[in-house]
């Protein structure tokens, strides 16, 4: 079975401190979230965590876009 990285590991590849883009800002902020579920892959669990704990995420649409990119990358 192929290795599947966690969503957090994928998200960290999107970090860019010089970018104002939504995905980069999400990644930059998640990096400093000490309670982010770093090993999680499940969309529902991640979504619930972010809805309850991530004041730094202005819209869940940003998470949806990031998770879609994650799923696409994990298919290859």
From Swiss-Prot:
Question: What Pfam families does this protein map onto?
Answer: YozE_SAM_like
**InterPro entries, alphabetized:** UPF0346 (IPR010673), YozE_SAM-like (IPR023089), YozE_SAM-like_sf (IPR036806)
Against SUPFAM superfamilies, the record matches this protein to: YozE-like
* Highest taxon in the source lineage: Bacteria
* Signal peptide region: none
Which family, according to UniProt? Answer: Belongs to the UPF0346 family.
Q: Which NCBIfam families match?
A: PRK13672.1
Question: What protein name is recorded for this chain?
Answer: UPF0346 protein Ldb1277
